[in-house]
Design a protein with these regions (language model features):
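Active-site proximal loop and beta-alpha junction motif in alpha/beta enzyme cores
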Residues: 1-106, 113-170
Length: 170
């Protein structure tokens, strides 16, 4: 078991690794903007969360790019999450990530934003939300009191995705 607790980056304040699962404690969220077509919130990075139908065929790159650079985000931009509800506590997520400027396999602050937006909009009543991304399955749990989300944990499996060796020659 490995445990680290301090503000690390982008809203992450703690890490616990146990039994091949990683638990990331995320920053509290107290501001969620609701619009007719989407939600906007900052979970360590700004996230536009939009619920769509037929996520599998949705053009994440084209639509994400328009939103990321469009008003009101403009040059500062926002990550853009497209979401489809699978059942009462499970959502499929595809994310267009600023900086990468393309769809990514997974985005931790993004799935955290999706779980909170789904709860805020009453698409789920559970405080343990399952999320399916191209990179695998994740889970976000939280406490909510008077629209303030605390004790937010993102968790998923610890999987080696890359191994390399290199030789430094002088």
């Amino acid at each position: 078991t490995l445990e680290v607790s301090k503000t690390i980056e982008e809203g992450l304040i703690g890490i616990l690794v146990k039994d091949n699962l990683v638990y990331l404690q995320m920053k509290d969220v107290d501001t969620i903007q609701r619009f007719s077509t989407h939600h906007f919130l900052d979970t360590g990075s700004p996230h536009h969360v939009q619920f769509v139908e037929d996520l599998k065929t949705f053009n994440v790159k084209a639509e994400g790019e328009k939103i990321r650079y469009g008003a009101p985000y403009n040059q500062a931009g926002s990550n853009v999450n497209f979401v489809e509800k699978i059942n009462q506590n499970t959502f499929a997520v595809r994310t267009y990530e600023r900086g990468v400027e393309d769809e990514t396999l997974s985005c931790g602050t993004g799935v955290t934003a999706v779980a909170i937006a789904a709860h805020k909009s009453n698409l789920t009543t559970t405080q343990q939300v399952q999320l399916k991304v191209k990179g695998g399955d994740l889970s976000v749990s939280f406490d909510e009191n008077e629209n303030i989300y605390t004790n937010i944990y993102l968790n998923g499996p610890a999987v080696q995705v890359f191994k390399s060796e290199f030789l430094c020659e002088h």
